[in-house]
Amino acid sequence: MSLYKIEQHFFENVTQHQKEAMLKDFEVNNDGDILIPYTHKGYMVNNANIEFREDIKAISMFSGAGGLDIGTQLAGIKVISSLDIFEDSVETLKRNKFFSHTIHEVGDITEITGKHYDELLKKEKPKKLIIVGGPPCQPFSKAGYWVTNEKRDSNKDPRNMILPYFKIISELQPDGFVLENVESILHPSNREAVNTIYENMEALGYHYSLLKVNAADYGIPQKRKRVFFLASKKEINATLQKTHGNEKECLANPNLLPYERVID
């Protein structure tokens, strides 16, 4: 257990109500500083000892800083290749020893084909292959609408990479894939984009589940809502059981843990 100190002069920037609430909940030292106890909780994965499955391997698209890749590997599936259009993102991944075995590439998904991965797949010889990717969210994000306050056609947005993603999927024919995006992709204004996803999954012979997830419900100290389209060549009925909840939910369900807070 450690103590985080908020010095007295901080209160010059808060309301009296906020100050009273903090003084009520936390200890105060002789100098008038608030002391907040907290436990170090590691969200680092660099030293995680993962036993990877031999039969399934993954290729990552739109890899960014590796969020989906981390989740994939924590689930025991080695990411053998990652791709992102931004060099800074790829350099970040290269410096993360959690992906020391992964081939990280700078590239534009619209300019590559499934043949790009022929040599890698011959070398790795996975019995089953999955692809994970979160196409750029800007065409579907609420934030973009708030900035411009204009109606947009997400299917005409050049940043919409749903079809290029499905082109790679159609060429590689993975046993399954993940398509992640922001919750607002399900807004009626983006119905055409969602229909494109469903139509392509069905045309390629995939069964699928749709999961709507709030990261706070699973022990992450932030409210981040995301949508996951999970597709498989076999029947799939994916569900998630939340592990955390607010005070009212925890009282109703003793199996739930209270939401994590950054201050904790």
Where are these regions (language model features)?
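Core alpha/beta nucleotide-donor-binding catalytic domains of modification enzymes
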Residues: 21-173, 183-187, 192-195
